[in-house]
């Protein structure tokens, strides 16, 4: 009977004693007699208010949930910052490759014969008539823009964040699949040719893919793994169809023999260039190059015929180049990695350098040029 009067809410108990009169005796089949005793009466005061510790626990749970949400948000923001940074680097890399492709120039002459120019000028650098670096630039641009929008949580066209993440996952999957295929082409069809910038682009694509795998939960990946496989197959099939008529280029390092030839300099030298060349020679500056290197010839053209003769130029392959040919010992001792390379005051400088820059870094002035001309 007591259970009917006890509320489940928190109760305050006040103990007291109340005198209870003895009940009347009634005859029953079995008679019980109750003696005159004092029974403790327990008045129960019930309150509908929540206990104080309950009030304290609610804010603590809310605070814990808020802290957890904040940590997840910070982690996602950091991930999208990585996306944006890597995508930006990829845009710079492919923009430079696009410039090389459009102008037909080469980035830097390596010690071996194969260069980025060989790769970019091959049939494999074009996909359905579009230069491959241009496609790469667009893809990196999309990744950079999409990741930046995801980081801010402000996607266009009403796209949800979940759909944005899956779109990013799909794009990076396509990029990684294409990069894997290009590495296969580079190692088989373009064997012997090297392109550092192409390898950097492939590395960046794989990095973006692994980031997206980490960003998308395993359960979500299992839901779309079939779609991702189909996407990779479509990318590879499309590239194969585009390259069906492409012809592999011979390996410079193994299939071609380059006999040594003397390069002809067509430009004439100015008095300033002649004086600068003599100054560089006097301070021990050396230019290391190879006869096949177009950049080496362009550097000499800056000086002109007469001034180039005054330079301390070191030809690293004076006997020509073929498979097994070793670089000149002087070049090997100087640890030359590409052409042209300048060593000025023990400082290694790679690539072509403008005359004004050479003059500035060696302390050559116009007055010295005038003095040299007067002596002549």
Swiss-Prot record:
Residues 57-77 have a biased composition (Low complexity). Thiol-disulfide oxidoreductase catalyzing disulfide bond formation of chloroplast proteins and involved in redox regulation and photosynthetic electron transport. Required for the assembly of photosystem II (PSII) through the formation of disulfide bond in PSBO, a subunit of the PSII oxygen-evolving complex in the thylakoid lumen. Involved in the formation of disulfide bonds in the lumenal protein FKBP13. In vitro, reduces phylloquinone (vitamin K1) and menaquinone (vitamin K2) to their respective quinol. Cannot reduce phylloquinone epoxide to phylloquinone. It is found in: Plastid, Chloroplast thylakoid membrane. Residues 46-81, 147-165, 214-223 are stromal. Interacts with the PSII subunits PSBO1 and PSBO2. Interacts with TL17, TL20.3, HCF164, PETJ, VDE1, EDA3, FKBP13 and FKBP20-2. The keyword Transmembrane applies. It is a multi-pass membrane protein. Expressed in cotyledons, rosette leaves, stems, cauline leaves and flowers. Residues 103-125, 187-192, 245-376 are lumenal. It is an enzyme of class 1 (oxidoreductase). Belongs to the VKOR family. Coiled coil: none annotated. Residues 44-77 are annotated as: Disordered. GO terms for biological process: photosystem II assembly. One of its GO terms (molecular function) is quinone binding. It comes from the Eukaryota. Its main location: plastid. Keywords: Chloroplast, Disulfide bond, Membrane, Oxidoreductase, Plastid, Quinone, Redox-active center, Thylakoid, Transit peptide, Transmembrane, Transmembrane helix. This is Thiol-disulfide oxidoreductase LTO1. Changing residue 316 to A: Loss of function in catalyzing disulfide bond. The chain crosses the membrane at residues 82-102, 126-146, 166-186, 193-213, 224-244. Cysteine residues from the thioredoxin-like domain participate in a series of disulfide-exchange reactions that regenerate the redox-active cysteine residues in the transmembrane domain. Changing residue 116 to A: Loss of function in catalyzing disulfide bond. One of its GO terms (cellular component) is plastid. Disulfide bonds join 109-116, 195-198, 293-296, 316-331. It comes from Arabidopsis thaliana. Disruption phenotype: Severe growth defects due to a limitation in the electron flow from PSII. The lineage of its organism: Eukaryota, Viridiplantae, Streptophyta, Embryophyta, Tracheophyta.
